[in-house]
Every structure is written in structure tokens, then in C-alpha cells.
């Protein structure tokens, strides 16, 4: 019964997180530059993992965010005040039976998480954002129905090349460094270094093919990049203000103090979990009445991939 459940949120190492996460998700467990916090969420009565959360520095390009703020934000302010949810993945069947994705999201939107990040990184987080998994190819998301804690603010711009997986990026980056006199293409202290390095790699490849007169290869390479960009669907972007009413003005530097909304205390972790419990109880009761409760744990194995009906 969800009303009897209790949860603990703990940060864990990359090694432990990745080893567990790959059992329940098809997502690559890549790092992103900047902040990285990996939470394991455990149900303490049963000592079982309910889900995984990885938070990190926000992406640079976001049309919905820019529209909401009224401009392209200063990167220093963006990194100081925004945090992004990269993994919000419930273990199954907890996610299906109890709306586990909503629980994990409420934890992300809680003051517990905000204060944790503030203490760890010496920042003043006042905004959380994440994007839907399936993009505009699917009309619903685990983040729907979470107002006022989380709101849809629009569709991300699809004209954007994703960064390479860590393994391939590391190998290619080493190749370029070796041929650049041991020097990195982008300075080590640069922001969004991985994205900038990848962009530089692409520019060098194009220039090299052009200078060697390899017109056909250049055309093929350009077509490949265009295709990679085209594979991206627009995704719904979601935003939480942690119960502050003047986040936009604060991030834009128009005020130096955050103002609490009347519902500010609702974002405390205990209250956030209680909000979820009511939703989860209704979900569980409906599934139970229909005989649709799931009992089997879903993990990724070579012999059961066809039996798992969703991609996380």
C-alpha cells in the first residue's frame, strides 16, 4: 500500500549508480559537464530501490526556457540557479503500479534536493527543468498532471546535434589531442566543454575534407550530420520554480532576493511525498480492481528484451 511506504534519498557513486542503472534502463549512463548528482531512492520498509535520479547542469540551448525568461540567460546565472533532470527512472513494476516516475519527479522538485545542491555546489538553485522521454512522437508523459509543482513550458528546438556517448567521445578526443601536439581542442576550464569539443571536431573534419578536395566524402559527412540532427524529436520541456514567485526576475538579475509563494512549504520533501501518495493510492486501487497489478521485476537481460514493452 503506497500510504505505508517510506523513502530514503541518498547520493551514490558513479560506479554503483551505473552498475544498477543499466539493469533497468536502456539509457546510456553518460556524464555531462558540470554538476552531477546521482540519487538512489529506496523504499525503507522493504529496503528496495524504487528509482534512479541523475541531476546535472542545464543544457545551453533551450527555446522554451529562453522564451520564459525573455532572453538567452547569462551562462553563469543559468548554472547557478538552474538544475536539470537527466535521469528520472523508476524501477519496474514500482513505476507502473504506483506512478513511480511522479514520486521521483516530486523529489527533484523538493526543497530537500534544492538545499542539497546548494550546499554541495555553493549555488542558489531556484529552478528545476527536465524534458519528456518520447518527445512529440507521443502525446503523454510521466510529468503530466503535476501542476503546480511542474509545468509544461513548451517544445525544445529539435535542430540540435546530441553529444556523443562517453566511450566514443573519449576515443575520438584522444585521437585529436595526439594530432594536436598533445593539446586539447578546447581549454580545460571552458564551459560546455564536451559540446564545444565535438563542434570543433566536426569543423576540423569538414575543413580537412574540403582542403584535400574530397568533395564526395565531404558531402557524405554533411549528409550524415544532417541526418543525426534530424533524428532528434522535439521534446516537451517541464519547469518547476520550487515555490518561488519571482524566479524569472531573480535569474535575470532584476532582484537580489527570492520571494516565497504561499504554497512554498508544499515543496518540502515530506509534503511532496504525501502529494504523491494520494495519486499512487488511486492508481494502485484502480489497477487492483481491474486485476492489472504487475508483480515481476523488469530488468534488461539478453534473453528478455522482447518482453519489455517500454524504453526508459
Region spans (language model):
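Conserved N-terminal entry element of GNAT/NAT acetyltransferase domains
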Residues: 1-11
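Acyl-donor binding region in acyl/amide transferases
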Residues: 14-17, 26, 35-37, 43-183, ...
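Long, hydrophobic/aromatic-enriched structural stretches that serve as scaffold segments
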Residues: 21-23
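Short Gly/Pro-enriched turn/cap motifs at secondary-structure boundaries
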Residues: 29-30
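Long, compositionally biased intrinsically disordered regions
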Residues: 40, 174-312
